[in-house]
Amino acid sequence: PLYSSAASDVYKRQVGRNGSGKTMLFRALSGLMKVDSGAVTLDGRRLHKDFEMLPGLGIMLENAGLYPDLSAVDNLSFLMGINKKPDIRIIKEYISRVGLDPDDKRPFRKYSLGMKHRLVFAQAIMDNPSILLLDEPTNSLDEGGVSLIRELVLNMKDENRIIIITSHNREDIDMLADVVYSMSDGRLTKV
């Protein structure tokens, strides 16, 4: 098993070269991808069936689930509306938290890469998930964006969550990780 059990006060971190399987692992953990064998379990309980999103899960994959022709508010409203009635006040709060203007009406496709990355992060955290999977959370960000995302992640670390992060950024690893795993050819090794 990847983790025989997970304590919410433990911060896991994976590192590895491009193509080593980190993003694929996140897709399997989240239920977005069918796995050939095995199951995702937490404390001995199977968390989901294939292609069924884990309840209480926030996941950040590059541009995942966001629509190019919708504004930030419309994108997050649509995603929040899948499970419950969207609360525009909360949506705007999360857009502001990641340093974006909630009143910006531009479509997502017109955002810079860093702005897109911030919105994907907001999408991952807006339902206050108990388990958070973050794939390269500071990638494509300027210095201010990196500091902001690191601060948000550190704050969430103190809120009784399970957080698993992939990164190539050594500074992120040193600052954010309690436990580090390296991934090579689809295999995890504790560092």
Language model segments and positions:
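H-loop/switch region of ABC-family ATPase nucleotide-binding domains
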Residues: 167-168
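Conserved ABC transporter NBD signature motif
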Residues: 38-53
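Single conserved hydrophobic/aromatic residue that forms the stacking wall/gate
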Residues: 1-11
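Conserved ABC ATPase "signature" region
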Residues: 77, 88-103
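Catalytic Walker B motif of ABC-type/P-loop ATPase nucleotide-binding domains
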Residues: 132-136
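Helix-to-loop junction immediately C-terminal to a conserved catalytic motif
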Residues: 30
